[in-house]
Amino acid sequence: MINCPVDNQMNNSDVSQRPHHEVVIVGLGPTGATLANILARYEMDVLVLEREESVYPLPRAVHFDDEAMRVFQSIGLAEGIGRDARVNVGTKFVDRDQKLLLDWPRPQEIGPLGWYPSYRFHQPDLEAELNRGIAACKTVTLHRGASVTAVADLGDVVEVGYSHDGAKQVVTADYVIGTDGAKSVVRAAMDCEWEDLGFQERWLVIDVQLDKPRPDLGDFTIQTCDRDRPTTYVRCPREWRRWEISLWPEEEADDVTTDEFIWPRLRPAITPDEGRIARKAVYSFESKLATRWREGRLMIAGDAAHLMPPFLGQGMCTGIRDVANLAWKLAAVLRWKAPDSLLNSYESERREHTRTYIETAVRVGEMMNSAETAEALTHAIRPDGAAQMNSISRDLDHAIGPQGDEMSGMRMPQPRLDTGELLGDAMAGRFAVIGPDEVLESVTLPPENIAVAISAEAHSEVAEALSDLGIIAMILRPDFYCFGSVRPQNSSGLSDVLAEFKKQVHS
């Protein structure tokens, strides 16, 4: 039995008589809300337990990327989320004299994933859209103001105890997913430790709502690299702006959150008569990975599984990738009769992938603390003496799929079908078996509730994508990574890929 402290409410009663759900999600931040929306597409019976009574009304996370947007697309919420967001133009790293050290421009065109590569957003807007999606899901039950007091894995089922509306409740679930942040009760129930990757700094985060537009402040994020006091300026949607200021070890939170400390550091950019400070908080930026992401029927995702400095804007994005990976595997086990061992691949695929993002964010943070301009110039030198940074695009390590297939775990582009819809819309949470008609007609395809067949001959951008990849057919996962591929010299190979697919994903 795996326990966090168990109340008496968990004892002396028949487990079979308790309300049962297929999945219980603990925590309703963006990661948990996205997971609930995805699972609803598979008509899963989901209970979400969130301790807060309402959505936090002020900004926290401020960035997501095209991969996250593709997941939002898969749950039918991309239009609303995109309407409230702002396409991000990029980041400039400068020294204390504002000399450009490193440029990180973000493309202003739709990218290969079908969306702009980078967005700035207002988190209350995002959470409102995600919660709107949950409200429309008939199979998802949400309890706000619910404090989880106990989690116990009994082997064939998980017991969850919680307080809600003044009463103690106990339910059971096939699986419990902790998306409940750095102090996760689910991670505690797993008795799971942190692996510390060595970065810890205290920063003051200030969110300002301007009284009127200030185009002179610029649209680029500005990272000021200064050994004494690194700072960050972020252009957020509408009239929201963020400043982040590194703190010295001896500076106390009560002292640095005063107007006397803050406003002199925001001048000359803005003054008190040009906007109001909506939020001021001291954060500890850390770099940590949970040593295990699964223990029996308990799993963790998002900040419950990893913490990273914000310098890449990938913290929330990583949580979205977590649940996109995990959700379809839960569907495979609970709906498609896949072996429970498939869920082990959640940790093996996601943990080291996440490590890359954390380590890169740490390097950026170290660069911001550098006194030497040369240390920032780690990429190709441009004629003006500044370097240009490229975005991370990482495939999965140890991905499931046919043994020896180098494309298994590779992140795939999203072509537009000749019908006008994006490929992900046609997939609707399923796998896609993609290839020419002759190849598709030569095999027995999975049931339509598991996979959709996409003809390369009927859709020109699909055919072009396969050609660019040097393959003639593939199976694309619901999280848009490749399961397996077929090379031109092996036109009969799709049957082998499908055999492996049936072995690993459904029976």
Residue ranges and their predicted role:
Residues R132, A150, Y175, T179-F285:
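Conserved FAD-binding catalytic core of PHBH/FMO-like flavoproteins
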Residues A40-R60:
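Glycine-rich FAD pyrophosphate-binding loop
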Residues I2-E22, V26, R41-Y42, Q73, ...:
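Helical substrate-recognition/capping region of FAD-dependent monooxygenase/halogenase enzymes
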Residues P19-H21, G166-Y175:
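Core beta-strand elements of the Rossmann-like FAD/NAD(P) dinucleotide-binding domain
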Residues R60, D65-G133:
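Active-site-adjacent segment of FAD-dependent monooxygenases/related oxidoreductases
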Residues A253-T318, H353, Y357-T360, Q489:
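FAD/FMN-dependent oxidoreductases across multiple families
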Residues R144-V158:
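A conserved short coil-to-beta-strand element within the FAD-binding core of flavoproteins
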Residues G32-A33:
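N-terminal Rossmann-fold NAD(P) dinucleotide-binding loop
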